[in-house]
Amino acid sequence: MSELSFDAPVWHHGKALRKGYTTGSCATAAAKVAALMVLRQHLIHQVSIVTPSGVTLCLNVESPHIEGQQAIAAIRKDGGDDVDATHGMLIFARVTLNDSGEITLTGGEGIGTVTRKGVGLPLGSAAINRTPRHTIESAVREAIGPARGADVEIFAPEGEARAQKTYNSRLGILGGISIIGTTGIVTPMSEESWKRSLSLELEIKRASGLTRVILVPGNHGERFVREQMGVDTQAVVTMSNFVGYMIEEAVRLGFCQIVLVGHPGKLIKIAAGIFHTHSHIADARMETLVAHLALLGAPLELLTLVSDCDTTEAAMEHIEAYGFGHIYNHLARRICLRVMQMLRFTKTPPVCDAILFSFDNHILGSNRPVDEIAKELQC
């Protein structure tokens, strides 16, 4: 994306909607400018960063302060016209230079602490997700050079109060907000507009000659395809939560093979016939797991443990401990069955495959060998 693509509005029903940027972008920009201020020993009032999606942001700096080898800076969160609980709050970074050559990243006041497994971060760590961790560390490294070290603390004085308006406590993230964002940009869109933009990408892929498509919920799926399957990500299209819609669009466009790739936290819902996977539509993850574990003869003790879990990742640990990892192949086959049932009136339905992977990019299960699927995708 170019810089202009951030400034360009998103149109919905004749109304121009303004884009925003994530808490991850705020933390990255704050850390970068704080590091630069320590090095230069003067205040800086504007900073630019390149987001993971390639968009350049030029952001105003608030509350800049330098004291010796330490500097503090803040960026105000702007969600554009997609206002959430963090909109308008200040995200601060405190950067202290040292001679260690290493960059350490911690969360301070107002940043949540991970107290449960299942969110992809270690217990006890700050709720700063993987992509923002990478962008913060990269921005600071770019600023200070290869030899110096730095201690980076991200904090948000309003964080604990704001977090009460989020789902963090339900996820076991306590005491503050999460620093999140895989693209760095907040795009305000109605559901229909968002679906249409995803479908447009499918149309572009089909027009380029592709006949096989990989549908993923988001960026993690694309990374898995690239790193673990060795398949050209040109075949990957994001489906977000709109599984049924995107499958129907792929059929309409004449794709001969659809491969669903994702973490069980999303794809397991399809096994229950849920084709819109946003939590406000339906959840049933634990109920689906319990039902299919029971079909495979799992003991009542395991069924009870899984039923009591709040996250799929937590349930997966119990499943592994009881030796029921084969459920993922079973679920993948069930997902494909549900898709084919949905397409039962289609004249020439495509081949459907499903692959489930873990947060650390390991294959959990598939409806048939992944090597076979990958080989077909490379044809």
UniProtKB/Swiss-Prot annotation:
Its domain of life?
Answer: Bacteria
Reaction(s) catalysed (UniProt annotation): Co-precorrin-5B + S-adenosyl-L-methionine = Co-precorrin-6A + S-adenosyl-L-homocysteine
Known EC number(s)?
2.1.1.195
Pathway(s) the chain acts in? Cofactor biosynthesis; adenosylcobalamin biosynthesis; cob(II)yrinate a,c-diamide from sirohydrochlorin (anaerobic route): step 6/10
Checking InterPro entries in the record gives: CbiD, CbiD_sf
Q: Which UniProt keywords apply?
A: Cobalamin biosynthesis, Methyltransferase, S-adenosyl-L-methionine, Transferase
Q: What class of enzyme is it?
A: transferase
Please give one Gene Ontology molecular function term for this protein. Answer: cobalt-precorrin-5B C1-methyltransferase activity
Family according to the record: Belongs to the CbiD family.
Q: What is this protein called?
A: Cobalt-precorrin-5B C(1)-methyltransferase
Organism this protein belongs to: Salmonella schwarzengrund (strain CVM19633)
Q: What is the lineage of its organism?
A: Bacteria, Pseudomonadati, Pseudomonadota, Gammaproteobacteria, Enterobacterales
